[in-house]
């Protein structure tokens, strides 16, 4: 095994986040009341300022996962940014007075951050997708943004990484030192991955963008604009992947509507968790 030195980030106690955009309360989950340019601004500022953190792109699926899992709810509360990925989260936010709130769709966020990164010189690493997808995405992004710096890709297995795979990933990231690791897994896998590996990988930010890898490489067709604006993109996804998604949408959508009614009519109080983040210290370790 190579004796190359790796850098591991060890989490300290969670501390209150510095000033950040206001949050809408979606069933107790704090979703930042922002639009696409503001989300890209936060990400850009974090990189320039040397902050370490992860970004969650969260819609109804993520909000409902947080109802079932305290661990997942905590992961969202510790995110640098939780963007409103679905129109229902935007509608609820606007009802709460966040009239400027707009949808921040994962694939759109990826393109906007990549576009801005060229002038800033920020670098990227692609983690996720089925075999060949990350490399395909690298080619797609390079064709669209010829000056973009994509310093590595990694296709994970559909399970937890083995110790050998962990070491291999850490070595690759340590050698390339990307500013951003884009994580293209499904919810909640990508959020769990970012939380578990944020302090173990030598990068600044991790951004979970779900289906963006498949959408940008044409594996999944994107929904028409009118379906996105009307909150019906889930129907478009369901049409393409009925056997995989029908249970998710049936359980999550129905459950969300029921719980949201309780919140909106003040029949149940969903307390908003304090936004936290981990302070970090650097520790050199040899593997």
Question: What do the PLM-derived regions correspond to, one by one?
Answer:
Residues 2-108:
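N-terminal nucleotide/polyanion-binding subdomain common to many enzyme families
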Residues 93-172, 176:
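Conserved beta-alpha
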Residues 173-187, 203:
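Proline-aspartate-enriched helix->loop->beta-strand connector
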Residues 155-161, 202-240:
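Short, flexible loop segments at boundaries between secondary-structure elements
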Residues 52, 122, 201-204:
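A short helix->loop->beta-strand "cap" motif at the edges of active sites that frequently abuts
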Residues 138, 191-200:
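Short Gly/Thr/Asp-enriched flexible loops that form oxyanion-binding sites at enzyme active sites
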Residues 88-94, 223, 227-279:
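A transmembrane-helix-recognition feature enriched in membrane-embedded lipid enzymes
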Residues 60-63, 185-190, 212-213:
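Short glycine-rich anion-binding loops that position phosphate/pyrophosphate groups of nucleotides
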